[in-house]
Amino acid sequence: MNDEYELLDSGNGKKLERYGNVILERPAAQAVWAPQFPDRWEKATARFDRVGGLNWEGRNRISKPWNVDIAGVTMKLSATDFGHIGAFPETRTLWLWIRSTLKEQIRKKGRELKFLNLFAYSGGATLAAAQSGAQCCHLDASKGMVDWARENAALNHLTEAPIRWIVDDVIKFLRREVRRGNRYDGILLDPPSFGRGKKGELYKIEDQLMTTLDLVDQVLSDDPAFVILTSHTPGFSPIVLRNLLAQFHEDGIFEYGEMLLTGKPEVNELPNGNWARWINE
């Protein structure tokens, strides 16, 4: 399986990553240690920082956009004004797990499974699920990001795959799904610390997450496979995420951990968010 992402180094509040043939230096506040490989930083194609604003150096040296394979999913990348590029590779191990788990559960249950991706961004997890043969629903409040995810679907030859593309506020959408009786076998949600819905609806994780999880529980099928909760919000540790899921699921298996940016074995891993999942077994 192709994977063209690699963490090259981190330290002094920054990270150095390779996306295909592009090497980027960007902020990583949690990297409070000294870099391991100082010479590698000179090879950066472009640099982004937030000192005195949002600034790219060398942005013109990046072909825009460019495509990279991450965990078996081809992603279109582009250097945005805010420093994001269209992929969060710390989630790639979750993509691998979602793909393999859904494929196995489809075989085991002998029926089609439905996967729901909430706050779905550019669609890496959606496309990994689609590659397993699952029916997918991809939801994000940003039309631009949903369009980006659809472009990624085309890059992966999944234009005709059974994927619903939804631009909407998560809570409004889930309430409609409850009323309509639509149910899902696997659900991933990556709520932001702060966000706005399609019509400006305010989403704050500390205020809306419990409501969201309650609605997620209501749209699960009678024989679901899993629920995955991830977060980049400080304070929402793996144990916190696990405990949140445990309020809605007494039985089953709970797994949790940090999301990590990784490279070759000698490179320090860089934590970048947390995850927890409930598995129905």
Task: Give short role names for the model-derived ranges.
Residues 89-109:
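Conserved alpha-helix/loop element of class I SAM-dependent methyltransferases that forms part
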Residues 122-134:
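Conserved SAM-binding loop of SAM-dependent methyltransferases across substrates and taxa
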Residues 207-223:
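A short glycine-rich, Lys/Arg-flanked "PGG" loop and its adjoining helix->strand segment in the class I
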